[in-house]
Each structure stands twice: as C-alpha cells, then as structure tokens.
Amino acid sequence: MTMLAPWALTLAAGLAIAVPVHAHEVVGTGPNGGRVTDAGKYHVELVAKDATVDVYLTDVDTKPVPAAGFKGTAILVVDGKPARVALTPADGSRLSGKADVPLKPNPKGAVQLTAPDGTSASGKFN
Amino acid sequence: MSIRFAAAFSATLLAAVVLAGPAHAHGGHDHGAPPTPVSNSIAPRGEALSDAFELTAVPRDGKLTFYLDRFRTNEPVRGAAIEVETPEGPRTATETADAAYMLPAPWVAKPGNHDLLVTVTAGDVTDVLTVSLNVPDARAAAPGAAMAQPSPTQDALTAASTIVGGLKDRLVAKDPVLVATAAAAFLLGMLVVVVARGRRGVPAVALIAIAITLTLGTAAFAHGDEDHGKPAPAMPPVQGAALIAPSEATTDLAQRLPDGSIFVPKPTQRLLVLRTTMTEAGTFRRTVELPGRVIPDPNASGVVQSSVGGRVSPPPSGVFPRLGTKVRKGDVLAYVTQPVQAVDVSDMRQRQGELDQQIGIVERRVERFKKLSVTGAVAQTQLDDAQSELTGLRDRRAALDRVRLEPETLIAPVDGIVAQAAAVSGQMATPGAMVFQIIDPARLWVEALSFDALTAAQDATARLADGRSLTLAYQGSGFADRNQAIPVQFAVKGDTSGLRVGQFVTVLAGTDAEQNGLALPRSSVVRSGNGQDIVYEHTTAERFEARPVRVVPLDGTRVLVAEGVGPGKRIVTLGAELLDQVR
C-alpha cells in the first residue's frame, strides 16, 4: 500500500480529467453582427438584411474559411412561409444569396452547406 | 510517509490543474454528431426536434421515410407538406396511408454523413429542421463483427479500452501542446515522488513544479478553442447485437437496449398509440369522490297537481301532452272537472227553481213599473230598484250554471318538457295528486352526499358511467345530516344532453388541502418488476427511459408526481403499460 497509493492517486486524477466536456448548443453573435451556429465542422454566421442573405464561414478557431467551391441553401421562415435561398460563394469567406421576399432581421431557419469535397453540413437558427 | 503522500497529492493536483486547463479554457462546445445509438439490428436513422415537431428519417431500400409527430403529444401529423433539400435539389415527400412521408432517395445508399434540410408545413406552423443521417459503410462494418462474440470480461475490457482510446484520440488529435502537457505533468509527478522519497530539496522541487505548471498551463490556456468534428466514439459493442450477423437485413424491432432504455421505432409507436404530455409543475387541490345524483333545478322545474278531486279531461287541443312534449309556462295541460254529489244536485235544482221564480216575478214588476213610471204613478227610484234586483238575480243564476260547468284548469308552471305524465282521460284525480312533472332539461343540478365539509364556491366535476365528465358549479350545501353526510348541490354547467333526472354520477370535488407537484394521468404510471412506480420519459424520438417516481393520489384520473421527474419532460400518458412489456 505504501508504494502503491501515490501512483494510484495520480492515475485516478488522470482518469478523472479524461471525462470529456459535454456538448451543447451554440448561439452567439459573430463579427459581422449575425447569429452564429454550428454546421458540422464549421461555424456559420447568418446575416439577413432585406432580401439579401449572407453566410460567413469560419472554422474551428473562428478563422475565416474561403467560400470558394462551397454550395449552400438557406431556408428561412418568413411570415410562416418558407423562403428558399440559394447561396453562392462571394468574396472571402462569404456566401451570398437573394430571397424573393424581404426578410425580418433574425429569421428562423436553417442553412445547408456542401463543401468542395462533397460533404454536407447544416446549421439551424432558431 | 506523510511527505510521500504530500508529494503524491501535489503531483495529482499539478496533473489535474495542467490537464484540466484546456478543458476549462475550452470556451465553446463539442461539434459531435448526436449519439448514434443502439444496436446493429436497427437501421440507421436521423431525427430532428423543434418545439412543435419531432421528425424521424429512416433510409431503407433507396427510399427515405419520414415520420412526423407533434413534439409534446407524440401524435402523428397528417396532411403536412415535407420538403427536403437533397443533393439532387429540393424534393417533396408524399404522404402514405399510415401517416408517414415517403421520398425516393437513391443517394441515401451512399455511406457517409447526409445532412438534410427539411421544411415542414403543417397547418399554419412552418418549421425548418436539420436531419443528420449517418449511413454506415457495409464493408467497414464487417470486420468489426468478425471479432464478435466477446466474453463478458472482454466486453468490459473493450469498454475500458474505448474510453482510454477516446482519451488518446482526443489527446493525439487535439494538439501536441496538450500531449506535452500531460506527459510533463506525469513526469513531474514521478519526479516529486522520487525527490520526496529522498526527503531533500522539497522547496526547490515545489518551485520547479510551480514554474513548470505556469509555463505549461499558460500554453494550454493559449489554446482557447474547442474540439471540432471528432467522430463520436463508437458505442461499446453490444453482446446481444454482436451475435446478429450484420449482413442480415436490419429489422426495426422494439427492444430494450443494454443501457435500460427502450427503443421503439416510430411505426410501432403508432401501433401502440403512444402519447405523451409535457410535465408542468403546479399546485393542485386534493379532490374527493362523492356519490351524486342528477336532480332538476328547483327553479326550472315544477309539478302540476290538481287542487280538487275530479275527472281529468284533455285540454282544448283534445290530447294530453305526451312525455317529452315541450310546454311553455301558462299552457293548459288538462282540466279537472269536479263531480257534483247527488245531494248538491238537488240543492242546486231547488235554488235554481227559486231563482227562476224570483226572476220571473221581478221581470214582470220591472215591465209594469216601466209603463207606470212614464205616467208618474210609480217613482223612478222604484223602477231602478227593481231593475238592480233583476240584474242581481240573473247574475246569481248564471253563477250557479257556471259552477256546474267550469272545471279546474291545470297549467304548466314553468317552461320545459313533460318529464312525467299520469293523465288518462276520464280518470278521477285525487286532490294533491301529481298529474304532470315539468323539467327544463337544460337546467339540471347534481346533489351529492359529502362526508367532508367542502369549501364553499368550490367548483367540481362529475363523471358519468360512460366516462363523460360534467363541469359543476357549487350552489350550496345542507346543514342537516342525511345518512351521516351532508347534501351538497351543484349546478351542471354547459351541455346537459344525455342526462336524466335521478342518474347516478361520481362527483369530484376539491378540498382545502393543496399539494405541489406534477400532475400526470393515472395511466402513465406503471409498476415495474420490483414493485417500484415508474413513468416512461420520451427522451429522443424513438427512445423511452424508465424513471422511478414517487406518486401520491390526486383525484380519480390523475396522480401527483412528488419526486422522480422534473418539469418540462415528455412523459408517456397512453400506452405506458405496453411500453413496459417491451423486452
């Protein structure tokens, strides 16, 4: 016991730390003033103004991800009706699209992204 | 010895601080996929929630089946429009007969992660849901199954190695700083122990320890970010499931999972008619059940009685009102003609003759006076007196006739319908006998016998034998004992159709005692094998978990959950006992 106890304690501490942090929803405000949510391995920031929908793409470290090669679709609920907005890469990390109807400042909806490698990811805005 | 322990503790603490650093510094969140559960015998599926809907997507044979339910009640939603953003563009799923929605989706056969955007419109509610479908690679799954059939010890080892592997994964994949931190902390711990055994240079060691901790800790904190997109660690292999060859077609069967939760696929949920309710904390009055009886409202009902004995005859319409006939207040329902006794008849004849005689005499006198008064032989006053006498005599004669002819009319005292009728033409009615009972069917009361003193103005409900319930408004209670209980009267509020006077009902009335908790229907609580009361919580779309609860009775239909579940949980209210049978 005399020799074992310290090592056992050390080991126990190591195991205790190994318990991973729990997952949770993310909602926040991004650098462009929009709401941020998770979409697969990316973070997306949704900025809706009038009929224009801008989606900014960032990665793990909230570093911008070049939007080139990405495809996207946003479906936003306007006055109880869904509005489908196709998103195309614009400058930098931005994907942009135009809706048929003017949007409210913080619409409910979701964004789906297809990366250049074909994987898809989606994020929900409540 | 104490120093050795102190050293061990400091090493532990050091390791804890250094390793825990990144975890605390982790300012964000995990981007892990939702736990892909269950066993190999269950087809892959995806689900999504919103505050209105619960959507489950099951890919099978190149088709995608969506099951849409209400989030709170688990009721299938019919007639909704489901539009899906697929890799081939937007597509609309068609509704099938069993309230599912089908979408041909050949692309779903491709293994990997499919993220779908589903727009649901049901009635005036529109929701956009994101569904993540993880279709496993059939070939990749095969080797895993080849090493199947592990013994229980192997099982435990596998589980342990998975946890350790997860940590290793996390450490290796994360960044070298973290690994270095962990390693340094470990070495430091060793160093401390070694030095402590020598019982030398303890302050120096402490200094070094602090210095290293600060350096490494700062480095760890500098990585202020989160863990992204790591595939969720595979579930520990399930022994039962491992026995099933993965090549077999996956059949979705309701089953009890190794963690004790119950997996019930959506089609089975619909067969079992599983319904849920959202728990809400509240204050409830304890209620008592009282035996009661429907009575007519005393202000809207009446009886029709004859005040005299006599022969009953129909009203002018020629027919007596039948049972159920609508009558208005003042309607003539029947006549009662008094019979005239023989002695009375002779008496009346005598009087009649006398009057007729007198009328004859006075008539002649009036004639004579009329002629003479013109000449002035008779005073005008004498003529007037004679005329008044004649009028008086005629009135008396007429009244005598009327008394013989006029029967008593029986009239309806209130508006309503004829509830009882005892009139037969020609029947002799006795004085005070009830001929008709009139009741307003829209105004009924309930009289209950209570053994407790009820709170005044306390509303109650009544339950009928067929399960219907009535809302009652308290009217008053007696003060005199009847069968060692107090009669309490309530007015029935709302629809009274189908009720009849005298019908027995069960009255549920509140008492003064108040209780706090969550009210659930009695049917949601089932008794588990060990005799414990449990309820089933609907945790995810197709999973139910048993929760032991402590319940106290509330009223006839509900129980109060005092402990075991909190508010805001979806608890199965219908079909809980069927769920309990799932093995």
Language-model segments: which ranges?
Chain A
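Intrinsically disordered, low-complexity terminal tails/loops enriched in metal-binding residues
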Residues: 2, 10, 14-126
